[in-house]
Amino acid sequence: MAAREESTQSANRVLRISQLDALELNKALEQLVWSQFTQCFHGFKPGLLARFEPEVKAFLWLFLWRFTIYSKNATVGQSVLNIQYKNDSSPNPVYQPPSKNQKLLYAVCTIGGRWLEERCYDLFRNRHLASFGKAKQCMNFVVGLLKLGELMNFLIFLQKGKFATLTERLLGIHSVFCKPQSMREVGFEYMNRELLWHGFAEFLVFLLPLINIQKLKAKLSSWCIPLTSTAGSDSTLGSSGKECALCGEWPTMPHTIGCEHVFCYYCVKSSFLFDMYFTCPKCGTEVHSVQPLKSGIEMSEVNAL
């Protein structure tokens, strides 16, 4: 029976990363609340909140504490991750929420401690210089001890996975799941699908620059736009000059490349600049030189139309 309870507790134990994520979410929420609160005072006199910043922060954190830990036994970050605080000092194995005294002490240690850390030097500034120096040394010594205690607590937390902060260890509260967690089955179908799609996308990014889109487009257009003259007829430059061999329209500034077909100047020049091995899509003739069509032949064709 005891072995079964131990296995159940180990299966429902909150992961270390989940507890640390909850702390990071709490810090992010506090920064967001404070930034949104300061936005309300942009139109006021500069430095208005500077004098009362520790007190205003303490009031905001107290407001958050009232509607999170005091009422729901969990911080905002813990609620997101489906965990909450449990009274570790209770001998009953059934879930026991933190007592009211523990919640109040939690507020004193977290909210009051941060307020005292920001206000301690201001409280002793008006004192005598010697007493201020002694108070400063004492405060530095206490802060150093707390930092050392937090470091030792964090090392123990990494080893045992319990009490993520020094405050939790001193008050005897630790994180547990809100509901019993069942064993999760990890499936790799989604990951495999994402890896395949990413690999296919990288392959396309590597392959597409190697494809001559302009040449492929010209080849397809040559299949779609048939020759106006038949194979048996005498194909002359005038009979084939009624349309551009690339775009199929009446040639604008007609030019030739050494074969019997006519091109728009823009079509043939852009294709030749894009591909130095450009060939005529109709007959496959290589570009020797781009020459304008003789005006006499062009005018005769216009008159024939």
Swiss-Prot record:
Q: Report the protein name in the record.
A: Peroxisome biogenesis factor 2
The alphabetized UniProt keywords are:
Disulfide bond, Membrane, Metal-binding, Peroxisome, Peroxisome biogenesis, Protein transport, Transferase, Transmembrane, Transmembrane helix, Transport, Ubl conjugation pathway, Zinc, Zinc-finger
- The source organism is Rattus norvegicus
- Give the quaternary structure: Component of the PEX2-PEX10-PEX12 retrotranslocation channel, composed of PEX2, PEX10 and PEX12.
Give the CDD domains listed for this entry.
Answer: RING-HC_PEX2 (cd16526)
Question: What does the entry give for GO biological process?
Answer: bile acid biosynthetic process; cellular response to reactive oxygen species; cholesterol homeostasis; fatty acid beta-oxidation; negative regulation of epithelial cell proliferation; negative regulation of fibroblast proliferation; nervous system development; neuron migration
Q: In which pathway does it act?
A: Protein modification; protein ubiquitination
Q: Which PROSITE patterns match?
A: ZF_RING_1 (PS00518), ZF_RING_2 (PS50089)
What post-translational modification does the entry describe? Forms intramolecular and intermolecular disulfide bonds in response to reactive oxygen species (ROS), promoting higher stability.
Membrane-traversing stretches: 16-42, 49-74, 99-125, 134-160, 188-211
* Function comment: E3 ubiquitin-protein ligase component of a retrotranslocation channel required for peroxisome organization by mediating export of the PEX5 receptor from peroxisomes to the cytosol, thereby promoting PEX5 recycling. The retrotranslocation channel is composed of PEX2, PEX10 and PEX12; each subunit contributing transmembrane segments that coassemble into an open channel that specifically allows the passage of PEX5 through the peroxisomal membrane. PEX2 also regulates peroxisome organization by acting as a E3 ubiquitin-protein ligase.
Where does the chain bind Zn(2+) 1? C244, C247, C264, C267
| Class of the enzyme per the UniProt entry, highest EC level | transferase
Q: Which GO terms describe its molecular function?
A: ubiquitin protein ligase activity; zinc ion binding
Domain comment? The three subunits of the retrotranslocation channel (PEX2, PEX10 and PEX12) coassemble in the membrane into a channel with an open 10 Angstrom pore. The RING-type zinc-fingers that catalyze PEX5 receptor ubiquitination are positioned above the pore on the cytosolic side of the complex.
Tell me yes or no: is Signal among this UniProt entry's keywords.
no
